[in-house]
Each structure stands twice: as structure tokens, then as C-alpha cells.
Amino acid sequence: MTVKTPAELKTLYESISFDLQTTYTGPLGQEYAVSGTHLRLWAPTAQRVEVSLYRKGSGGEPIGTLPLERGQQGVWSIYLPGDQHGRYYTYTVTVDGISRQTGDPYARAAGVNGTRSMIVDLARTAPSGWERDVRPVIPPEQRAVWEVSVRDFSQDAASGVRPAWRGKFMAFTQQGTTLHGDGIHPTCLNYLKRLGVKYVQLMPIFDFGSVDEAKPLRRQYNWGYDPTNYNVPEGSYSTDPTRGEVRIRECREMIAALHAAGIGVVMDVVYNHMYRNENPLNDTVPCYFFRQNEDGSFSNGSGCGNEFASERPMARRYMIDSILYWAQEYHIDGFRFDLMGLYDVETINAVRAALDTLPGGRDILMYGEPWQGGGSQLHRYEANKANLAMLNERIGIFCDDTRDTIKGGCFNAREPGYVEGRPGSFWDIGGAVAAWCRSDRLPPHAPSQIVNYVSAHDNFTLWDKLLLVRYEKPEFTAADGTALAQNRLAAGIYLTSFGLPFLQAGEEFARTKKGKCNSYRSSPALNRLDWERAEKYHALVDYYRGLLALRARFPRLSSTDPHAPDALYFFSLEQPLVGWQLPAQWGDGAAWQALCVFYNPTETSKVVPLPVGRWQMLSDGISSSLWRGPARVYEHEAVLMPYSATIFGQI
């Protein structure tokens, strides 16, 4: 078939006949065996495909170039006899007389910077005991997600991590790390086990293009939302990016170490765009995998130059294949979808259905950002907030309604939210507590679809936002008692709300990026987790720790029952106070018969009436672990401290 322009390609790809002729369900990529390896590439518009073989992942001439044979549905294949483990390769794909050299879109391993793919025997990359690694069983009431970049986690010299492992996958495997090695103040994995979060969401760990793996990291830094190879771990996070098997083994070691600590791993996936338009997908089948405008040019709903055409059959298949590969070969416990609004509902639901077919697959988390990064040519139902009712009930969304209600809008640094005293915002706090199940604004299938948060890697840290609202020229590194109290209040709200709690790493120790709202390529020093700050703000860390443990002892807040929030009873209080009562679900093992919670966003103490009964104070807004000590029992009324979330349990 001969096509000349991107517009003609668009017409071709959107035709039913093209789908019928080219949709393929057989194996793609490498099929390794000691006796030989099959390579298969879907390239239906190509006139010729060749594979060049190399001894190394970079440099040197090919040791041979061989033609592939065209088969049905546009699949090209070749069989390479003998043990090919460790052999690097590239394809040369010729379409309309233009030849492009590229990697394998289905590559599982790659050389430095991902330019050359590598044939790999995955069994040889398995760390010791990998066959015994299993996903931890984490009940809903214990679920809370802590988001971090592999680089940020340990690159601070104070982390106590050995220098060669700082900023690498292997840092997650080092046991017993402490601040400057003092043996007292925990850091990294040691810290996570004490904090009590049960999921770590890792910012992109697939191979991305914005860091040069061939050069020392030093001042190089990027979050990694720049995909190059979707099925290959990032080389800069390995101790040797020149050897394709090392990054696989070390990524698996990291996951196994987290699992051994009882912590699940959520992978941040960015199928919505690729780093460059010249990439293995586009070089193999020009324009097919990316959404197009009417003139054939790339649509840019990602804001990054292109957007993935999830609605096209082989693009949808690629995305599902990739997700299943990570779930099966890396034992991933959850997937966070960047710009999920750029995918069609049918594809996202198909991903959920595919995961559910795996052993334990129904427990794999799945949630995403229900928005886009710009105008899109997706003319189907988008997997966004407006179409939440069309998504599977076990596909969650980041709730910007909750985020903005609590702390203020993220696009205006000075805009206050409830915790900073925004007038009228108390009306929406009730909606947030109920995970919007009792609101027409955002009715989910179940409260567990709502991801509650006030900070993530995008936009200002919570601490910086609080200071920017209060001060014209904030001192971000200075202690501030009011901001600390507002920070505690913000956490107290979303950690006592229905839904899935989520926090940016370091939110619990007043993480600052000194007012930088988008640090995706800022200095490593600005982005790193400051472990000395974690010790300085240890009382705030303990506050989060206590709330997480308290929440786990009242399972109804994490219920998947769509009617669970109906049991909330909101009190009539003076504005802007908010108070509510929630009985425990019979037989769920709750530590208290009911919870009674009050939020006070004012700078003065307030007296509030209590419901009939005996109420133990669990948290006074400063200490969230009062429930661990001698019972402080109240009846009739209680005093709320300024800027506080006060929690009582009925006994």
C-alpha cells in the first residue's frame, strides 16, 4: 500500500478496511529461547524491514544486517538461531522509500539511552528469591499512597544511603538507613516502614529521554515524563546503564524490597505522549499511534507535541500489552495514568478488564488524572471527570475538587482554600468528606474512586502554597506556626474523608521547593527529599503517622460501598466550622462505635456541642495519637483549637 501525506495516512488508519486487514492478536516483540529467538514487528505500511545486530548497546558497527519476512496483518518476523541473550539490535523500516532506523517498540531491554534494543532472557535478570516475591495483601482501610521520584528518594547525602546507590533503584533495598548514619533518625525505606503508608507511587521508571545516561548525573535532572521505551526501566536509575540487563534486575530488586516491607508499588505510566516525534512507534508505522488533526499533523492534547491514539486497535493493544507486562514481570501493584483524560473510556475500561484476568489482578490499583494537557482530537468519550460514571468502579480519579476546596486553586498561588479561611468554602468540605457521593457535581460509582490529596509532584508543595497565600515574600525555609497548623488541618481533612488518601513525599515534613511550582527539570538539590528537614519537622511526621494508623482502625472511611457516605450526619455549626458523625459498619472491626470529627479553620478556639454519649479524644489537631494513651473522655461539649481537625471516637 502506498501513502504519501499525513492526511492520507489519517484517512487510511481510520478506515474499517485497514483495521480488518491489519489488526493482529499474535505475539509481538521478542520471543526468547536458549535455542533461538523470534523477533516480530507490526509494520503494515512498510515495504522492507531489516534488523541490524550489535555486540554492544552503543558504538561499533553491526555484526550483521538481515531482512525480515512479511507475514499476515503486516507483521514482519525473523528467527535468530542460538542463544541471543545480550544481543543488541535495531530495525530499519522503509516506508514509501524513506528508511528509518529505530528500536523495537516492544523492547524489554535496551542499551544506554535506549537507542538500541536488547534481546533478554528475563530469567537471568531475576534477583535472588524473585520467584517467591508476591504482591502484599493490603486491605482498603490501610491504603494510602505516597508519591516519590526514584531520584528524589535518596539523592540527599544525608540519607545514609551508600553513595553509589543514591538516586538509584538500589537505594530502596538498603536496610536500616538513618540520617547521616546516626542510627537514630530513620530515612528512606526505614522511614517508610515507620510512617505507615502502604503504597509508594513511583514517578516514571520506564526509559525516558530527558536525561543522558551516557553522562554523569551531577546536575542533570528530570521527572521523566518523556517516554522513550515503555517496557524498559530507566537506565539512569541503574548502577550501569550500559548493560541492558542491570536496570531490569535492579528495578526488580527495588520492588521486591518494598514488597518485603509490606509496601505495594504503583507505577506512574505516561502512554499519552512520547518524548520525541521520532520514536520507535512512529518510525515503525508513521502517524498510526498518534492522534491527528484534519491536515494530518499531530494533535497536541498532551501539551508535549503529540498524543497517543488509544482508540486505534493496535495502539489500544500496545497499551494493554505494556500494562500487563509490567504487572506480570515486575509484580506492579497499581498504575497511575498521567493525563488519563487523553484516553478513551473504552480503552481504559479494557485495561481494567485485562488486569482483572491476572491472578490477584482485581487488587491491582488503577487511577489517573481525569484531565488533558490541551485541546485534543479525541472524538470519543474521554476518560475524564465528566465521564466518571462510564468508568469501571475500580478506576479512580485524582479529585481536584477536594484539593482546591481544602487548600485553594493550584493555578493561582495566592488563592486561599478552606484551611486558609476562604469564605464559603465550608459548603464544599462536606462534599469532599463524602467523596462527592452525595453531590451532583461529581457522583462516583463508589467513594473508593476518589483519590483525595492536597499536593502532588505538579504545582506548589502544600507548604509553599500555604506560605504564598499568607505572605507577599515568604521565607520558605523558616518555621511558621500558623502554616504548620494549617498543614495539619489539611491532612486532617483528607485523611478523615471517604476515598483513597494520597500525598506527595515530604508533605508530612513541610517539604518546600522554595516557591517553584513546576520543578520537572530544576536542580537535584531543589527536588531531593531533605532528610534533615524530616527530622526537624518530626512532630508533623508523627501527626501524619498517627492519622494513617487511626484511619486504618475505622474501616468505613475506606469503604467501597457506594451508599456508605449516606451514613454521614453533618452538624449545624457556626460558619465556617464543619462537623460530622459517622457510625462504624457493624462487624468491620472498628476500634470505636462511631467517629465525630470537627474542622476549625479559624485563628481562634471554638466550643462545640458533642452528640449524646461518651467520646474519647483521638486527635486534638496537634497530636493524632492521643488514642494510643490514657483515654481523655468528653461529654456534652469540647473545645477546638485554632486551625485544627479534632477527632473523637465513641466508646
PLM features: residue spans?
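The feature marks proteins involved in alpha-glucan
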Residues: M1-V34, G71-Q174
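Glycan-recognition and catalytic regions of carbohydrate-active enzymes
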Residues: Y24-G26, I493-K516, R528-L595
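Carbohydrate-binding surface patches
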Residues: E31-Q47, Y569-P611
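Conserved, mostly hydrophobic/aromatic
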Residues: L41, Y91, V148, L202, ...
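C-terminal beta-strand-rich structural cap/linker in extracellular carbohydrate-active enzymes
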Residues: A43, H85-R87, P630-I651
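Conserved alpha/beta catalytic core and glycan-binding cleft of carbohydrate-active enzymes
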Residues: V120, R352-A353, T357-A510, K516-Y520, ...
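Substrate-binding/active-site clefts of carbohydrate-active enzymes
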Residues: R151-Y330, L339-P359, L365, Q377
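C-terminal accessory region downstream of the catalytic core in glycan-modifying enzymes
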Residues: A479, A483, L529, L547-A549, ...
